[in-house]
Amino acid sequence: RRQRQMCIRDSLYLVDNQLSPISPHGARFTWNNPSGGALEWAFNSQVGIIDTSGDLRWYLLNGIINDPADPWTSGFMMGFQQTNDGALTWGFGQRYVKYDLMGREIFNRRLPESYSDYSHAFDNAQNGHSFLRVASSDYRRPDGKRVHTVRDVIVEIDQNGGVVDDFRLFDILDPYRSNVVQAMDQGAVCLNIDESKSGQTLSAEDLAKMDANGQFGDIAGTGPGRNWAHVNSVDYDPTDDAIIISSRHQGIVKIGRDKKVKWILASPEGWKKGWAEKVLTPVDHNGKPIKCENSKCEGSFDWSWTQHTAWRIDSKSNKDVLYLSVFDNGDARGMEQPPLPDMKYSRAVIYKIDQKKMTVEQIWEVGKELGHPYFSPVTGLTKYMEDTDTMMVYWSTAGLGASPEKKGNKLGRLNPHICEYKWGETTPVVDIVLWDTFGYQAFPINLEKAFTLN
């Protein structure tokens, strides 16, 4: 571990990691009636709280409630949030839970019927409800085949666990848009790491074979029953009762209560009529449109690529202008793989979106100048911290990419960075380095909320 100057807070950070980046070759369970889904996504969870010296101050004994031998309690723990009462909410597999920091159970619930395979996102919204990223447990495709879908449903749940609404993305977006799916590196698709596929991409023929062979499950592909969307964050906008999703394999999308797309923050490539009109226009600080062709733009503006955590900065946004923080992982940047793997980089980005004019301005970024050492091919977080007016960035899988200096080495030594940057600056005031751990997310924990204010 290492730290740079600490001048903004005496912080504790919750860290949600894995010890190993390699997924098991054989899972204990898979769905078979119907097939598909991501039940086998049951990685080890390593959840703790560290201080700014990197010392462990709290650890979650997840085995008490998380049993890999039980399909109803297995799953990787993801989507941690600290609620206003100081407790923690998160989910794993077929469950979503709430506990305080002393381990007291507030609730531990099965997902509602018709939904399965929670992962990634648990948003406690301003309307008192929670939005969970799940999947459909029994969807009949247009070709008549029944499947579990994969990471493409958002369910809204009230305080008592009742279903209020859901957003079925295969009915809202185009599940056959394949541009990003074909361009991305198949060696690292979120937590599915397979170094034997490093640098490989999918072709249109590969995608067609999946349909011909009836191949479904947690595989990159197109169509319901495959990992065509990979939604990894959900955020509620109270000004218009809408949600903002980060779809790793499509882009960032705002969807209204009427299930209509409000806008899309992504490369215009591949969007058909009905969606193409919703793609935001990039502009400079004077509001002048920026020329973009073939998924590349003039100047410093860039879309986000295979991104995570598209979150509204509530205190700086209003009903017309929205500030959005994004962790731009950077795989498939420009809808292609670069000539050399060490040309890849990740970014933390803030976009300013004028929702009336349908424009987007990039107002802050960090990461391009850091280059490949900070490249995080999967996972990651960018989050605004209102109490300190800083940007929290977790370069969660730095070091995972290929190490060109070591011949034949496709997986490097992991060294995630927990960083905080003062608003508008690009030099971190906090920089904590972790070694030999596979990161998912990290964020500051407020002890006053947990033990004093409530």
Question: At which residue positions do the language-model features occur?
Answer:
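Beta-propeller domains
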Residues: 200-349
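Structural signature of eukaryotic scaffold interfaces centered on beta-propeller domains
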Residues: 18-36, 70-84, 120-127, 138, ...
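Loop/turn-rich, solvent-exposed surfaces of beta-rich toroidal or solenoidal domains
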Residues: 304-417
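Blade-loop segments of beta-propeller domains
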Residues: 56-124
